[in-house]
Amino acid sequence: IYTLHSYSRNVEAFTFGTRLSRITHYLNKKDVSDAMELVNDTVKDWSGGTRIGETLSSFNLLWGRRVLSGGAVILVISDGWDTGEVDKLDREMDRLHRSCHRLIWLNPNLGYEGFKPLTKGFEVIMPHLDDFLPIHNLNSLLDLGSALADLDKTKNRVSFGAVA
């Protein structure tokens, strides 16, 4: 995310766990270690579980119109384990998907043999995704780079959500 932001100032970045935190301004630091230290010091809901539907609701309400204009490509980096309401998750995923050009979910578990996204949350998440890709090693980052390179960059803005 840091590298993509350094490539284009149109990249917005958020974390979500039990609440939404915008971290874009921390990515302006010249050193990635400084940026990560600021994020770690500021985001208070690391390892607190995820309520994806609630945090997407906050994003859609507070940030959607501001950062999803112009055919945004959204990358969500999450294992998808959700502790919130499934109906709310479904509604907010639908709203998010309708608001963007492309919705790509990057799952760190997807690259491991035997993993299947069988949670109730994933039952409602999957129909709203344009792409469901692994993000577990350097090769998966290269694959993501190829997928993004195939998009029409002149019409797309990229927003990121990273799980806390």
Regions found by a protein language model. Name each.
Residues Y2-A164:
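Acidic, glycine-rich A-domain
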